[in-house]
């Protein structure tokens, strides 16, 4: 069986450069820069049976969507009323046979994968979603949506990589950002994409095929530009499935494995603490509504790479276990440590800060839902050293009525920093950026791709992915959360929101760790003239010229979020309702009663954005309750000022008559407690690229 995720050959940088300079190649092999890219894409049409195609909601899936064009930039393609799975596989193998040394790429290929798999029965689809590979009618299929589709038959294999995650934007925006294609060519592609909803059998050859050919031609140019820029920065990924391939190259190039202990050699207690203490980035809205006044943002420059650059070597030090609080010198000197604590804030001003505003810098993960809250008290949680130090500063101020350190794992390192090279890449990127050298994009892509590999949960041959290291990953995110909290907890009345590595507030933050500047880990500050903040992650900023910028959204394209409609919703105190077309992929379809009918169809769905969230019963960290909102009590409308959100009143679950401690981060190969229900769903959808 073919190795699935980590079977690439590693070519050291020195050897790669020598081969390129001397035009040498390994026996029988073609150099990476000499391998041509072949672009792949497909198009579909909807067979409407409804009376109003222009307003088709298709809730029952009666208007079927068909794949009627699939092929490559070489000119090979297959077309027909509704292509079969075998037809699509065969054209892939035909192109591979004719172009054995080419690299095959697509852009945002998830839609195409579902359409290509139309003939696979439900049981087969469930199997391949779980296992990512299977035999079917003489073909051997490997698929990881968002990364690649691979088909093998008669010892001939074609793998199509999905380039989308390299760019994380629409194809048109990628062309514009990377200076690929002329203005008229890009306009033609945009026009074609806008007309996809009106594709029919009748205009396949006259309109669709010419547009499709132009798109593939530009896709090849985009792939060439990506490779040229990566190579110019000394980055030569062995695969082309996204930033993870870049991270894989960098980890191998800088011999990261030498700084990682064997997974089975890590003490069980450290592995347990790592799962309990890990938490992701902190998204949290504190105030929502319209604010007509100065708004300040402060963002950490490359926050995760910064935290990563200071990590210790885990292969040359020792984990030490402490019962109770370690000595102060140990806490001050340690880089990496995890602390098991419980706490509750005291009465008075301290309680006002914690209960009425900013909760402590530690998370609580609910066992059933897997959601994380930042609470004013905690029956038990493991946290990393950066956030623990924040709490110790508050402890010294006498802010707690209860603060217990139950145990700790502290890492004593030898002072070596295996990721110090990140700082060199960041500095080089700054120089390239100042000089207008596009290689800066490769440097940015490289260092920003690293953290994800350390936190990866899916993809390992034997369960544990190659670069998984949760103690490192947990320290990285904790460093970022601690920096946000350290600079802002005293200024809760001014805060609008946390956004992972940034803060929005109505006054400038005057205590920014590392200061303001362009260096790694310093802060970039900006000022705006207003904000409309609807709910966590959904907001509009107004620049200093009085123009509203494009919205920040979650799960809905920007063009569907209209500022005027959001304002109308505020004034009327109603939810903002957004309509969008959604392609129903298998993972989502299989969770619905009429899944077989709606799979591979387009539906019109309405998404609702309520003011501040969903009120009582919401799973959110904070919520808007009019009776508890001082601005509402004072008679201010949503469009008149910012309204303060209250901490969720959600209590802690009980286990054997006592409050349960914060639950562990779920790992498929190492279970502590039960898997949260939302994690089960997310795991299935992630495997099919739908998260």
Describe the role of every protein-language-model region:
Residues 1-42:
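N-terminal accessory regions of nucleic-acid-interacting proteins
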Residues 25-73, 302:
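Gly/Thr-rich phosphate-binding beta-strand-loop-beta motif of the actin/hexokinase/Hsp70
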Residues 39-41, 160-161, 295-298, 304:
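Short hydrophobic beta-strand that contains or immediately precedes a catalytic carboxylate
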Residues 76-195, 214:
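Conserved DEDDh/DEDDy metal-dependent 3′-5′ exonuclease domain
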Residues 113-122, 171, 301-316, 507-512:
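Short active-site loop/helix that positions an aromatic residue
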Residues 171-257, 484:
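Acidic, Mg2+-coordinating catalytic module of metal-dependent nucleases/exonucleases
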Residues 222, 227-287, 314, 319, ...:
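C-terminal, non-catalytic extensions of nucleic-acid polymerases
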Residues 297, 494-499:
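Short beta-strand
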């Amino acid at each position: 069986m073919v190795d699935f995720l980590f079977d690439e050959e590693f070519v050291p940088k020195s050897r790669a450069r020598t081969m390129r300079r001397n035009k040498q190649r390994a026996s029988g092999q073609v150099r990476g820069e000499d391998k041509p890219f072949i672009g792949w894409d497909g198009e579909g049409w909807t067979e409407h049976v409804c009376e109003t195609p222009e307003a088709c909601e298709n809730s029952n899936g009666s208007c079927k969507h068909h794949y009627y064009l699939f092929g490559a930039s070489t000119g090979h393609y297959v077309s027909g009323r509704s292509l079969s799975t075998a037809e699509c596989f065969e054209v892939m193998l035909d192109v591979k046979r004719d172009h054995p040394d080419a690299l095959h790429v697509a852009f945002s290929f998830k839609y195409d994968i579902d359409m290509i798999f139309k003939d696979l029965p439900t049981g087969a689809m469930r199997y391949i979603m779980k296992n990512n590979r299977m035999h079917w009618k003489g073909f051997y299929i490997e698929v990881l949506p968002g990364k690649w589709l691979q088909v093998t038959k008669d010892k001939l294999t074609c793998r199509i990589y999905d380039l989308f995650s390299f760019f994380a934007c629409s194809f048109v925006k990628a062309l514009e950002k990377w200076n690929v294609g002329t203005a008229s060519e890009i306009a033609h592609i945009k026009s074609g994409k806008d007309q996809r909803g009106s594709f029919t059998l009748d205009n396949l050859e006259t309109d669709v095929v010419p547009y499709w050919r132009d798109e593939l031609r530009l896709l090849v140019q985009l792939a060439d530009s990506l490779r040229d820029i990566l190579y110019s920065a000394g980055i030569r990924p062995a695969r082309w499935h996204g930033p993870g391939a870049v991270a894989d190259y960098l980890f191998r190039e800088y011999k990261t494995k030498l700084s990682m202990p064997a997974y089975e050699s890590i003490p069980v207690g450290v592995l347990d603490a790592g799962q309990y203490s890990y938490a992701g980035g902190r998204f949290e809205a504190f105030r929502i509504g319209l604010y007509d006044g100065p708004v300040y943002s402060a963002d950490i420059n490359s926050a995760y790479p910064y935290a990563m650059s200071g990590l210790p070597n885990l292969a040359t030090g020792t984990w030490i276990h402490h019962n109770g609080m370690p000595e102060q010198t140990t806490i001050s000197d340690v880089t990496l440590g995890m602390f098991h604590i419980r706490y509750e804030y005291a009465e008075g001003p301290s309680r006002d800060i914690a209960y009425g505003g900013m909760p402590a810098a530690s998370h609580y993960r609910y066992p059933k839902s897997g959601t994380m809250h930042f609470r004013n008290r905690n029956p038990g949680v493991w946290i990393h050293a950066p956030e623990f130090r924040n709490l110790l500063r508050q402890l010294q101020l006498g802010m707690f009525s209860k603060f217990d350190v139950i145990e700790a794992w502290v890492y004593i390192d030898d002072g070596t920093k295996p990721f110090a090279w990140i700082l060199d890449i960041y500095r080089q990127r700054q120089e390239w950026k100042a000089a207008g050298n596009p290689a800066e994009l490769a440097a940015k892509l490289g260092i920003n791709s690293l953290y994800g590999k350390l936190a990866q949960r899916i993809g390992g041959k034997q369960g544990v992915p190659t670069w998984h290291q949760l103690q490192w990953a947990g320290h990285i995110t904790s460093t970022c959360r601690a920096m946000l909290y350290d600079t802002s907890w005293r200024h809760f009345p001014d805060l609008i929101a946390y956004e992972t590595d940034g803060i929005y507030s109505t006054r400038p933050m005057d205590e920014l760790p590392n200061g303001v500047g362009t260096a790694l880990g310093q802060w970039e500050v900006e000022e705006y003239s207003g904000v409309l903040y609807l709910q966590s992650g959904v907001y509009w900023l107004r620049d200093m010229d009085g123009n509203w910028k494009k919205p920040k959204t979650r799960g809905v394209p920007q063009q569907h979020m209209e500022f005027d409609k959001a304002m109308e919703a505020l004034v009327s105190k109603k939810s903002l309702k957004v309509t969008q077309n959604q392609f129903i992929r298998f993972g989502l379809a299989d969770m619905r009663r009429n899944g077989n009918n709606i799979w591979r169809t387009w539906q019109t769905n309405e998404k609702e954005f309520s003011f501040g969230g969903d009120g009582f019963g919401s799973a959110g960290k904070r919520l808007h309750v009019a009776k508890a909102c001082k601005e509402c009590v004072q008679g201010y409308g949503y469009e008149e000022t910012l309204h303060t959100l209250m901490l969720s009143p959600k209590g802690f679950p009980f286990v054997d008559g006592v409050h349960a401690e914060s639950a562990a981060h779920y790992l498929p190969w190492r279970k502590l407690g039960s898997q949260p229900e939302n994690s089960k769903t997310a795991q299935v959808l992630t495997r099919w690229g739908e998260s």
